[in-house]
Amino acid sequence: MATLSQPQSALPKTKIATTFGLSKDLKSPISVKVCYLECTRNNVSLVPLSTKFEDPTVFKKLSQIYKNSDLFVEIRVYDGKNNNLISTPVRTSYKAFNNKGRTWNQQLKLNIDYNQISIDAYLKFSICEIIDTKPSVFGVSYLSLFSHDSSTLRSGSHKIPVFMEDDPQYSKNIQYGTLIGLTDLEKRLIDYENGKYPRLNWLDKMVLPKVDATFLKTNNKDHDYYLYIELPQFEFPIVYSDIIYQIPTIEPITETTSKIPPDDTLNSNIIINSIDIPMATSHDPSIMKVYDPDFHITANNHLNPNATTFDPVELKYRKLERNIDNNTILDKELKPTPQLRDELLRIMIKPSNAESTDNEKNLIWKFRYYFSKNNSGNDPSNKSVKSFLPKFLRSINWENDYELDHTFKEIIPFYWNVDKLQIGDALELLGDYFNPYTLGKPTYQDDSMTSKSSKMKSDEKRFIKIYNNVCFLRKLAVERLKLANSEELLLYLLQLVQALKYEALIYEKSPPFCERSDQIEDNASSTLKSPLADFLIERAVENEKLGNFFYWYVKVENEDQLNNPHIDGPIKIYMDILNRYIELLKAHCHENRLPYYKHLKHQIWFIKKLTSLVELLRASFKKNEATAKKVEYLREYLANSGNELLKFPEPFPLPLDPSVMICGCYPEESSVFKSSLAPLKITLKTIEKKKHGHATSQLFGKRSRYGKYPLMFKIGDDLRQDQLVIQIIDLMDQLLKNENLDLKLTPYKILATSPISGLIQFVPNETLDSILSKTYPTSVTYSGGGETSDGPPSVSNNGILNYLRLHSQEQQSEEPISKSILSTNTSQSNTEIPVLPRQPKPTITSDLGVSPILMDNYVKSCAGYCVITYILGVGDRHLDNLLLSPNGKFWHADFGYILGRDPKPFPPLMKLPIQVIDGMGGLHHENYNVFKSYCFITYTTLRKNSNLILNLFQLMLDANIPDIQFDPSRVIEKVQEKFCLQMTEEEAILHFQNLINDSVNAFLPVVIDRLHSLAQYWRA
C-alpha cells in the first residue's frame, strides 16, 4: 500500500492524499464470480420438430433443442504478450437451469496470484456443453485483468460479449482500456451494484422495475450472448507494479588477490584455487601453483546465470568425505551408535519427496554397508533397512563418476537383488525423480570457458552413464513387480498406469546430442519398449481380470489427454499402449483360442449401450419431470428384446467386476435415481459358477443358476477420485488382513469408463440419517440386561441399535475368513496364497439384544473406517454418506473431498458421531473399549506401511484428480502428517485416543448434521 499526495490547485496549498495498493504485494489467488448468461435475441433459433425426427443426431447438441440447455464455464488465465496459458483451468460445477435463463452464481478461484501476472494478462471464458460425452465449445469471452488507461486492476461487475466460435483471432480484440459495449444505463447499474451509490429501499422499489423495463428496450444487440461476471473489490485501487531485479556485478577474481602485498616476515598460508598451500617468502624461487580441477567449475558458476551456485568448500568436503579409495575398507565394518541409529531411523521414515540435508546424505553414505549387509526386504521387523535403497540413491551425487560406479558396480550387485527389494521401494524407483534428464540437468549448462568439443564429449559420456543406470533401476523395479501375483499387482495397477507417463519422458525423449550413441540401448526410441509398458501389456494379455482393468485405466487416461491438450507430457503414449495391447490380445486369443478379446468387445458394446440410454432419457425428459415417468420409460426400454439389454447376445464378464459373468438384466428391478444427472440403477442378470459334485448337470445337461448384480451407471461426474480412494481402502484392507486383522470393510467397486462416466457397485444399505429417524416396533426395542436397561435413553432407544436388532435374525452364521492377497514371501508370490490362522473369537458382548456376529461386524468396520478416513482426510462427512448394511457393516460413500478439503467450515479431523458410539452400547460399554483397541491396532499397522501408501500417492501427483491437482506440492505432506511418523508408537496411540475423544465430544459437527438433515428435508 502506498500514499500519493498531489496539490489540488496552484493557489491553495492543500493536498489530496490518494491511497492505493500495488499488484506485486497482492499475494491472493485470482477469483471470479460467474453470474449468468444473457441472450439478446427474443426468439432463439432452435431445431424444428421435423428435423428432430429426420436426423436424431441433433439430440447430441442440446443447445439446438432447448433454449436453456446445460452449459458450464471454464476459466483460464493467459499472458497477453505471447498468449501463453499460465494457469490450470477451473470450471463451474453442474447447475440445473430453469426457464428464466442460465444462471450460475458460482465463485471460482484460480491457482495463480495477482502478483504473478503481467499487465497484459487476460481471462478467457470458455462456455461449453457436453456432446458425445465430451466437452464442446459453445462460445468464448475475453476480459483483460488490468486497465491500461489507469494501470489499475479491474473490479466489480462486468458484461462481456460472447463469440460463438473459439477462434484465436478473437483474442486480438481484447479491450485493455475502457470496456466498449456498456451503455450509460448499464454503467450506472453496475456502479449501483458495486456500492458507489447509496441504497434507499423506498426509492429502489419504485425505480428499479422501471429501470429494468428501460434496460430491456435499449438492450445492446451487437452480440447474441453476453456473459456477466463479478471480480473482487478491494478496499483500495490496485495499481500494477512489478519487481525489478538488479543484475549483480562481480569483480574479477584476480583484483582481490593482487591488492594483498606479500608479507615476507610471516610464515602464512594463502589459498590458491581452493587448496591450502604453505606460503614461502617472496624471495623463494621454489614458489609453485597447484592446479585444482574443481576450481573452474565453481568459478564458471558465477559467470553463468543459469548454473546452480555451490559452495566450493562444501563441494571439496563432500569429495573428501566420499573418497572411495580411502574409506571403503573402513566403511564396511562401521556400525552406528545407538544415538546415530535413532537418527538414521528418523531419516528413513521421511517421505520420498522430502529433501534430505547434506549431513543426512553423508550419514546414509557412511553406513551404506551396514544397511546393505543387514537388508531383508521380507522381514517386517527389520525397520532399520526399510526404504534404505531409494534413500541411498537419493543421497549420491549422480554427476560424480566415483559414486555412481561404486553404487552400481559394488553396492547394488553384491547386496541388493530383486528378492530383497520391497514393493513400495520398487514403486518409488518408477517415479519421476529417477529421470536421467533431471538427475544430470546441471551438467548441460553452457560453458564459454571450456572447449565445446571436449565439453560435449564429457557431457555425452556422463549422460550415457546416468541414463543406463536409471534404466537399470527401472528394470530392477519391474523385475520386483514380476514376483507379485496378479491379484496383488491389481492393487497397484492404477499407479503403474500413471507411471507410464514417466517412462515416456525417458524412452521417447532423444538424448541432448544430435547422433544416437551406440552405448544407449535401442529401447530408448519408444515407450512401447520400456520395461514397465512391456511388462504390463504382457501380464494384461495373459490374465483377463488384470487386462480388464488395464484396458479401462489406459482408455480413460488416453481420453483425458486428448481432451486436455494443455496437460504436460507426451500425448500419444496411452493411445500407442492401448493399440499395442489390443493387437497383442487379439493375437494371443486367436493363437490359444481364448475368449478374452471377444469379451472386451462385448464390454465396450455394453458401455456404449448404457451411454446411449442415458442420453436418450435426458433428451426425452426434462430435468424437472417426475422420476416415475423416467423409471417407466427405462423399464419399457430394457424389457424390449429388440434393444438387446434384456438378454445379451452372449454372456461376458462385467467390466466393474470381471469375476462376474452377466447375460442380461431385470427390468423390474432397474430404476432411475432422483438426481439432476439421472444416474441409472441396472440390476444385471449374472451366471453363478457351479459347484463341483452336482450330478444333475451330467444327467440332464447344463443348467445355469442365475443371480443378481445391481450397479449404478453415471454420466456427468469424474469418478477417478472416488476410484482412487476405493483402491487405497482396498489396499489398506489387504495390509490389515495380512496382519490377520479383518475389519469387515466394504470397499465397493468403482470403475471410471471415461473422464465423465463410470460404473458403481450398488450395495444394499441405509443412511444413518434414515436409520436414526425411523420408528421401530416395540418388539425390536430391547431393555434386557446389561448396560442398556439402566443406561441413558440415547443408548437404549438408539436407532442404529434397533436397526441391528431388527436384522440380527437374518445372519446367524459367521462369514468365512477373508485372506490377504498380498505376498508375505516373494518366493511364494506366484504360488498359492498362504493360509492365515483362524481369527480368535470376537470379544464383542451380546447383552444388547444384537447378534454377536452383527455387532462384531459393526464395531470392527467402525474402527476401520474411522482410521482410514482420518488418514485420507475425507471431507464433507454427514449422516447421508455414512451407511449401514443389513449385515451390520458400517461404511462410507461419496469421496468428493479428500486430503483435508471440505466445503463446510471448521471440519473435524475425524467424523465419529456420538450416535455411532451409542450404536455399540455407549461410552461406558465394553464394546467401546474394544472399538478403541481396534482403532489403535489399525493405526499402528498402517503406520508401518506408510512408505507404500505414500509412494502410491507420489505416483498419482500428475493424475488429473481434482483434490490432488488443487495443491499437488502438499499432497504427500498432508497424508504424511496423519501418520505422525515423528512419534513413537505409544505417542501415536495417545494421539489417536485424543482424536477419538475430541470427535465424540465435538458440538459443531452435531449442529451441522442437524442443519444438513433439515436442508435435505426441505429439498425433498
Swiss-Prot record:
SUPFAM superfamilies recorded: ARM repeat (SSF48371), C2 domain (Calcium/lipid-binding domain, CaLB) (SSF49562), Protein kinase-like (PK-like) (SSF56112)
Residues annotated as domain PI3K/PI4K catalytic: 666-1004
Gene Ontology biological-process annotations: ascospore-type prospore membrane formation; autophagosome assembly; cellular response to potassium ion starvation; endocytosis; pexophagy; phosphatidylinositol-mediated signaling; positive regulation of transcription elongation by RNA polymerase II
G-loop: region residues: 672-678
Catalytic activity line of the entry: a 1,2-diacyl-sn-glycero-3-phospho-(1D-myo-inositol) + ATP = a 1,2-diacyl-sn-glycero-3-phospho-(1D-myo-inositol-3-phosphate) + ADP + H(+)
Deleted gene: phenotype: Leads to defective acidification of the vacuoles and a lack of growth at pH 8.0. Vacuoles are considerably enlarged and electron-transparent. Shows aberrant patch-like accumulation of vesicles, which are localized in the periplasm close to the plasma membrane. Shows a staining of punctuate structures, possibly multivesicular bodies (MVB), that are scattered all over the cell, the result of a late block in endocytic vesicle transport. Results in significantly lower carboxypeptidase Y activity. Causes disturbance of normal nuclear migration. Also leads to avirulence in mice.
Main location: Golgi
Name the UniProt record assigns to this protein: Phosphatidylinositol 3-kinase VPS34
UniProt gene name: VPS34
